[in-house]
Amino acid sequence: MLILVSPAKTLDFEQPPLTQIHSRPDFLTHSQELIQVCQRLTPSDIATLMKVSDNIAGLNAARFGEWKPDYSIDNAKQAIFAFRGDVYTGFDADTLTPEQLERTQSQLRILSGLYGLLRPLDLILPYRLEMGTALANPKGKNLYEFWGNILTDAVNNAVAEQGDYLIINLASNEYFKAIKPKKLAGQLITPVFKDFKNGQYKVISFFAKRARGMMARYIIDQQVSSIDELKAFDVAGYYYSEELSKPNEPTFLREAQ
């Protein structure tokens, strides 16, 4: 079972990681191509392109300028410990045991605009480059065209290594658009999380992001290996709804918080 998640805009490079064990991203040469494009952007260009404040644009211009591919554990951090956001709050990587961390490294993949597809222990430098950014580059007009089939092929390779052809998509639509579902060599399962509000069950972004992280952690903790086992997910008050589920979209409900 391979789990796909999105990265986070919120980063933590202050707190030391739980382990010195690390790996290197597979697509650093591609990352360097993108960095070279980004290094030509002014802070004003970045503010317009990414729709961010001048302060954030200036910070990211500096990050692009300082980025070098030969970074190490001394000035970088493993992705699973660097990303902080709702998904990662739900996943709570800081409480993983060494055995759970090993399973996470094997089963979890993080889609990234800059790095393509990350393993949890892959070292990253601070950056902001969302997958939906319309960054013109040598391969096209945006990052979806830049990555092309590369990430789909990488997911298929990871699935083949697992020997289990279940792919659990817990990524956002923005990031999963970088994958070509029809070319995936496995069964794609996309869980849906709905909370009760104003008289109906609906997807509430903040809660859904946390739930995706909690489900990813549940899969690791419980060593889930089948869809039936996935349906037993019951963290934080969620429960499986057969009535609202579709064959490849199991739906989980939660009452008003």
Swiss-Prot record:
Pfam families: H2O2_YaaD (PF03883). GO terms for biological process: response to hydroperoxide. GO terms for cellular component: cytosol. NCBIfam families: PRK02101.1-1, PRK02101.1-3. Belongs to the UPF0246 family. This is UPF0246 protein Shewmr7_3045.
